[in-house]
Structures are given as C-alpha cells and as structure tokens.
C-alpha cells in the first residue's frame, strides 16, 4: 500500500486556501491571507518537519507569488528560506536504493552485512526527509575514511598516499639547531577569479561581494595585495594586519557587460615552515588578565565551552597541569577520531545553533574545520589559548580550502598543529607504525609552509556584516555574495565560479 505523505495533505490544504482567496465560495468577504503567505507558512511547516524537498518547492512558489504581487521584501525572505532548504537537498541527494547501488559498485568485494552496517544514520549521517532516508553526497568518501583496510587498499592501488607522501620530507627532516622557529621560507603568488555568467544576473540591483585576501601572521609575512578588480567598485578592505582578509565590493548589475561578471584578486606572500622544540619545564605562566589571553580562552559561536565539553577536556588531560603536555594529550585524542566530512548545511538548516565543537564531541565526526574547532575548544576549556586558522593548502596535487589550529605557550608563542593532515599517516599503505607516529608527532607542534592564511580564527565576522542567515559564519575561505534582486542566492553561483591558483615564485 502506498504511503500517503504529508506533502499530499499540504497540497489539498493549499488548493482549499487558493479557492478561498480567489473568492470561489459563498463565505462573507474578509481580508484574505495572500497565497504567498500561505505557501510560506506551509513551507515553514514542511521545513520544521525535515521535509526539505517539499519545503524548497513551497518556498520557491511563495517567492514567485510575492514577486508577482510586487512584495519584494517577502520574496527575498522566501528566496533565502528556499536556499537553506535547497542546501539540504543538494547535500543529501541519494535515497536508500541509490546509495546501496553506489556502495555495491564501489565496493563489490565487501560482504553484504558489512556494507549494511555502514548505512544506519548514526554511522552515515543520513536524514529522514519527505518520507525517505537520504544520504550525504560525501557518503562514499566517508566510508573510505572510516575503514583503514579500504583506504590502504585504495592508496596501494594508486601507489600514492595523499598528503603523507608529499609532506614526509618535512616531517622526517631533522631540525637544524639554532635556526629558529620559522624556517625554510617559500614565496607564493596567487590569483583568484570569480566568474558569474551574465545571463544568471538581473539587470537591476547591486551584487555585494566579500573576497578573501591573505593577512600577516607569525608564519605568513611580506603580504602584498597586488590588485583587486574591478577596482572602481571596492568599498573597503580590512588590510593585511587584520584578523581576517577581505576586499568588499558593491557592483551595480546594470554595469555588467559581456558574457560574465568577473572579480579578480592578485597577491603575494612568504610562508615559513614552523618548527618548535619545546621543553615543558620552560613553558612560562599565562597572564590571565591579558586581552589576548581572554580572547582566545573565551567561547565563540563554533568553539563552545559547554559543561559537557569541559568535562571531556578534564577526562583527556587528567591530572596534568603543564599547558604543553595538556595540549599534547588533547591533540592525540582528537586525531584518534576518524576524519569525516560532515554536512554543514544540516547544521545551518537545523537552526539549532549547534557549535561545530559540540557536533564533534557528540557525534565523533568532523573534517578539518570541525576538528580544529574541537581542538581549540578543548584547549580553551583547560585555560590554554587556542584558535583555528582558515585558508588554503597548497600541497602539490591536493590544493584546496583547509583549516588547522594553534595553541599558545608562554615563552614559545603560537604553536601550530594540523590534526587532519596528521591523520593522513593512517592512510599510508607502506608506512611503518614508527613512521606514522613520527609523522603525527611532527604535526603536533610543527607545520609545513604549504599554507595560505585568510583568517586567524573561527567565527570572525565579515566586514561589513552581510546580515544574511544563509551564510555559514564559521570560516571565510571563498567569496561570499549578497544580491537582493537576484532570483537565486548568488552563493550557489559563487561556489561554482570561484577559482584560485597559487604558485611558488
């Protein structure tokens, strides 16, 4: 028997509402609720019930209705609600039968009972929506990350372990006494290009764009912003000494000519390898009244210090009191959890405001951003200043957005680590256990120079504030856009249209 879903009931209710609004009954005339309001209300109900496909359709219908009636503010609100629902639809594209078919095709030799064990939602992060179970677009990748026999067979077949093979020369190189903590500088020159087809853009209104740029840090020096184009539309820049690198532009859409709207950046910087040799006995005392100490030991949106997290931190460090040893204990605990690509859309859609540090604590799942936020939260819970840095990695062949973390030790400064890159040692098909341990040890307090830093910590707001609930504010690594006259959230186009190339010079 075919199940009657709630969307069928909603459809009937909408038809009734439309009949009443059209005056097709003999009821006394009253001030009607607009069809847009009805559609929006039912869309919100579907959204709250996790029926994201239905919610997306209803919000789009509401947007179209509001647009036709000239209510631009309501149309924009409906568009933004549709965007959040659509993010869920796009991140969860596969139903049960589809994901089973994909898993069988990708892992034909794995026993059926083992494959079935991967699919419960507490293992796969699946959701129930619109009467079906839907699976994350990253499900196949996560299966590989969670099963080292599969991952090592895969790297053996390729004859290469991503990240590990490229970075072993740094991790295994002996430190040079007296060379300092910032060594082996590499100068990089980068270009960024955002290209949006003109036919996607309306002819009126303004496209507001926040474009990422490099900033100065302890390891990233000599930052030069060579150009940002079109320069005539730049409204502000944060500068290279800020905590976040941004060029903000306002582009009149009436000025767009040709086949595409193009926004470009060009920049140069020098990145240093960071190498530390820390004597726990020489770690100084914190000045707990210092503004920087207070800043990096306080909670933020995604680095939360809940009672449960504080308890977890205490369980990890035990009776240890030395900040360095505590940070090391936290690092080794975090890298024991398998790398996992989560659904950021799910966290945004839930509207619960669940911090990423809590998501990792509760689920055990996290990617580079989530794990770095979790590490920072655990350190802060123990009175150790910590932060999560965002930007790009330029590891040859594996370039892309990336996040890692740092903790502060008096007498030494900011100590880097990269829990995600460290976990890559487990993927190696030919490394010994001793080599894996040596590699992980390197990334507990050192860092390679294949980095491009855009933001010094999680939750640093964009300047100016876009006041856009569809944007995740955890990290700023790719451009963000806001356009009140665009029929579709421009960030869908920006994600597809942004390209970065960074090369050694």
Language model segments and positions:
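Intrinsically disordered, low-complexity N-terminal segments that are enriched in acidic
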Residues: 80-274
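Conserved small-residue packing positions in alpha-helical repeats and bundles
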Residues: 36, 43, 63, 76, ...
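Low-complexity, Gly/Ser/Thr/Pro-rich intrinsically disordered linker/tail segments
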Residues: 439-505
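Acidic low-complexity segments
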Residues: 47, 239-243, 255-358, 362
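Active-site nucleophilic cysteine motif
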Residues: 323-330, 364-379
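Alpha-helical segment of the N-proximal tetratricopeptide repeat
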Residues: 31-61, 65
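Hydrophobic/aromatic-rich core segments of domains that either
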Residues: 41, 45, 370-465
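Secretory targeting signatures
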Residues: 1-32, 405
